[in-house]
Amino acid sequence: FPGNVTANVTYSLTADNAIDIKYDATTDKTTVINLTNHSYFNLDGHGAGSIEEHELWLRASHFTPVAAGSIPTGEIRAVAGTPMDFTQPKKIGRDIRDDYEQLLLTGGYDHNFVIDDWDGTLRHIATVKGPKSGRVMKAYTTLPGVQFYAGNFIDVQPGKDGVTYGN
C-alpha cells in the first residue's frame, strides 16, 4: 500500500480498573489502515485453564461469515438459531464444537460480529464473565464490528510455574 504510516497505541489503566486502549495513526499518502490488538484474557487468572466456561454476551444479532482461510465472504448473516448467537449470555464452550460450517472452517470462534444499532458513538458491545474469579470485563467501541476469537489456533506455550497456555 502507498505511503508511510506512523502509529501509536496507548494502554492506560483507569482509576476504576478499566483498560483503555487508544490508537492514533497518520500517513503521508492515502492508504488503508486497520489497527487492532491481539490481547487475550482469561478472567479466572493464571493457570485457570480454558475460557470455555466464561460467559459471553455480544450486542450483535449478525456476523460476517468467512470462507476457507478465514476470508470474509461479504455476507452479513443473522446469528439467531446458530451457535454464533451470543445475544443472550452463554458459555463460550457451549457450542464451540458444533458442526456448524462457520465453526468448522475456523476451528471455533474467529468471526467479526456486526454491532446492533451502530451509530459511531462509544457503546457497550460485549461482556465476559469468569466463573471462578467472578471477574467481569466489558468492551466498548465506536466501531461497527468486533472480532471474537477464542484462541483456536494458539499453539501451546509454556508459562509461569510450568503452566501451559494455548488451545
Question: Residue ranges of each PLM-predicted region?
Answer:
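An exposed, glycine/acidic-rich loop-and-rim segment of catalytic or binding clefts
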Residues: 1-167
